[in-house]
Regions:
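A short, ordered amphipathic alpha-helix with a cationic face
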Residues: 62, 343-348
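Bacterial N-terminal signal peptides
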Residues: 8-17
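Short glycine-rich, low-complexity/disordered patches
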Residues: 84-92, 193, 310-317
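N-terminal alpha-helical interaction blocks
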Residues: 24-122, 129
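Sequence context surrounding c-type heme c attachment/ligation sites in exported
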Residues: 23, 117-290, 296-304, 347-425
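Mature extracytoplasmic or organellar-lumen-exposed domains after removal of signal/transit peptides
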Residues: 271, 277-284, 304, 308-345, ...
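Boundary at the C-terminal end of the N-terminal hydrophobic targeting segment
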Residues: 19-21
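Positively charged n-region of N-terminal signal peptides that target proteins for export
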Residues: 1-6
């Protein structure tokens, strides 16, 4: 069968087996997370879906079932996920792949902490929900009408696809992968694949996706909605701005989790070393420090969009996603927010990821977070003038520093003292 010149997504994908037939994950170069100190299978979780299930268990809230829509509208409302975050993909990358095609794409929705997938006429909704300490947690929800709907954790099945050294930074995570597809939406054999982030070439993105909105002279591999019947979906759009945000956010989430895991593993090993050598508690060797400073440095670069692929023309979505996303703030006294879009030369007006406000970022262990804050301050204050951050102008750095000082809780005192000193100068 002839392949279409398109790229498809492998995003939030689940392997064919369900939670009742889990498979042991083979070691493919990823971070050890099953045992101490990570203990990924722990039931002590604080991700949004886990919190929601606890509310169900207490009888505090209930999901509403809508004929033809299932639990999806109620789930999105309860989790605070906007309908206009919808993106439509027709690659066969869900465990429900037989039901996915260009005529019946899968719908994906997201906010800062949760990703939701629905397949038309499918048997389950698919979730990736981010726990502050454990990162991506995978769930399914039976989408048939039952008296007591319940989120079921589906971990090792999902991890067959969702843990890889080169695509999810070696931790349980999320990814957008572009692959050449056949006309049915299946991946064509022997074809390349690309992981999509904000640093991906524009022309390699979004094949296998439906994309609505405009990108000017910039070309991409996405497909216009055209004759697709969008009436079964919650929205008629697959907004290009939502696609841009999704590409950034997925890899940012993975870097946060990687830094968290590597720091915990390093501190765990250092604690054992200190006890064996009778060293003072809290001593960190140079080797141990390098173990978490390497991913932390990568996080800083990505957080500040250091390698972002520049936009060559204006991008417009048209669904209202950009407006609603930006309205979430927070804003400083001048009305500036890290959620403000540029969409002419780059994604955001102030290039520092809004995920710096997330619980997952705040949960990064102290030594790594101290390093991140130190490096951020060096870059934003202008002390760091290396080529790695050349994309940030002096005005960008000053604005981001001021926005964070005004809106981000828990910053080192050095930040505020420095800004106050600058403001006192005549």
């Amino acid at each position: 069968m002839k392949s279409t010149p398109a790229f498809a997504i492998v995003s939030l994908a689940f392997a064919a087996a369900l939670v009742h037939a889990q498979i042991v994950v083979k070691n493919q170069g990823f971070v050890p997370f099953a045992d101490a100190p990570i203990r990924y299978r722990s039931e002590n979780l604080a991700d949004p879906v886990a919190k929601l299930q606890k509310q169900f268990d207490r009888g505090a809230i209930a999901l509403e079932y809508e004929p033809g829509r299932g639990y999806l509208p109620s789930v999105l409302r309860t989790l605070g996920i906007a309908v206009n975050s919808q993106t439509l993909v027709f690659s066969k990358t869900s465990f429900q792949y037989p039901k996915i095609s260009p005529e019946k794409p899968r719908a994906l929705y997201f906010n800062d902490d949760v990703y939701v997938g629905q397949v038309r006429d499918g048997m389950a909704l698919e979730f990736v929900s981010f726990d502050p300490m454990q990162g991506a947690i995978f769930y399914i929800l039976d989408d048939r009408h039952v008296e007591h709907p319940r989120f079921e954790r589906a971990e090792l099945d999902c991890l067959q696809c969702h843990v890889a050294a080169t695509t999810t930074k070696g931790v349980p995570g999320v990814l957008l992968r572009s692959v050449v597809t056949t006309p049915s939406g299946a991946q064509a054999g022997g074809t390349p694949s690309y992981v999509t982030g904000h640093d991906s070439p524009f022309h390699e993105r979004w094949g296998g996706w439906y994309v609505t909105g405009t990108s000017g002279k910039q070309t991409h591999m996405g497909r216009a909605v055209g004759t697709l019947d969008t009436s079964p979906f919650l929205a008629a759009t697959s907004d290009i701005v939502a696609h841009l945000v999704l590409a950034h956010q997925t890899q940012m989430h993975n870097l946060i989790t990687q830094t968290n895991y590597q720091t915990r593993l390093a501190l765990y090993a250092e604690d054992a070393r200190n006890k064996a050598l009778n060293l003072p508690a809290g001593t960190i060797s140079e080797t141990g420090r390098q173990r978490f400073e390497r991913p932390a440095e990568a996080l800083v670069r990505y957080l500040l969009f250091a390698d972002e692929t520049p936009l060559q023309d204006r991008v417009e979505g048209g669904s209202g996603f950009a407006r609603e996303f930006a309205a979430k703030g927070p804003r400083d006294a001048q009305g500036r927010s890290l959620r403000d879009f540029d969409l002419r030369k780059r994604i955001f007006k102030y290039p520092c990821s809004y995920l710096i406000y997330s619980e997952a970022f705040d949960a990064i262990p102290g030594p790594a977070k101290d390093y991140i804050y130190r490096r951020l301050f060096e870059v934003l204050s202008g002390r760091e003038q290396g080529p790695e951050f050349a994309s940030l102008s002096g005005g960008d750095r000053k604005a981001i520093l001021e926005i964070l000082a005004a809106t981000k809780a828990g910053l080192p005192e050095e930040w505020k003292q420095s800004i106050q000193a600058v403001n006192r100068k005549p």
